[in-house]
């Protein structure tokens, strides 16, 4: 049975025994909720999520497109793949570079 994590997301249908799962483990989520695209899933239990944003260049009075890459824990009950549009939520640091967890794979 998936527990309520305090966000407006659908809980996963599968169950897992991951301690760092916000639905079936003890990992609390708080802070930012970001939507992005999975660009890599080669790490064990972690995905790289890229999000686009605009940066203003004052000299030219224009905006340039930039990409920010974030590492997010991928619980076994969610299993996000490359190309998926995912919603990630901030949590406590799980490793040196992983401070987000995947909470939902959004349907295109």
UniProtKB/Swiss-Prot annotation:
InterPro entries: NA-bd_OB-fold (IPR012340), Ribosomal_uS17 (IPR000266), Ribosomal_uS17_arc/euk (IPR028333), Ribosomal_uS17_archaeal (IPR019978), Ribosomal_uS17_CS (IPR019979). This is Small ribosomal subunit protein uS17. It comes from the Archaea. One of its GO terms (cellular component) is cytosolic small ribosomal subunit. Keywords: Ribonucleoprotein, Ribosomal protein, RNA-binding, rRNA-binding. One of the primary rRNA binding proteins, it binds specifically to the 5'-end of 16S ribosomal RNA. It comes from Methanoregula boonei (strain DSM 21154 / JCM 14090 / 6A8). Belongs to the universal ribosomal protein uS17 family. Part of the 30S ribosomal subunit. GO terms for biological process: translation. One of its GO terms (molecular function) is rRNA binding.
